[in-house]
Amino acid sequence: DELFEDLTVNFSNTGYSYLALLKKGSDLAKENNLEGSLEVFYQLKESSDGFFGNNLINDIARTNIARISIALGLFEDALSALEKYSNDEDAYTHELKGDALSGVGSNELAIQQYQSAIDKYTDNGLKNLVELKINNLETNE
């Protein structure tokens, strides 16, 4: 833990630090320590953000923040993590936005995001899963 702290504090803007944070956040999530994992992914997002940051790592951090926040019922936090993404993003981002919007009760907007996900997914199994989410929202209206 001491080496981890040294790496992630003193060398926070390096690829090694990013990978260490990514690994730790993933390990904590696997151990079902979602709050701890969320904290690590926020640290990763902050250190990889900005002009000299790393866009790929930042996107991974934001996606994980959104996933974990949704699992914890923190739907507004999930939306905040995803707010930088426009409508030209990948299918999974649209699905996450739909999940978060559904969680805050914005069902019409959630359905729009789910529809965008279906349009962009190439895997029929994933399309069917998102269709179920839409059907569930329409049934509950």
Predicted regions and their residues:
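Short solvent-exposed coil/turn linkers within tandem alpha-helical repeat scaffolds
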Residues: 9-17, 46-58, 84-93, 119-128
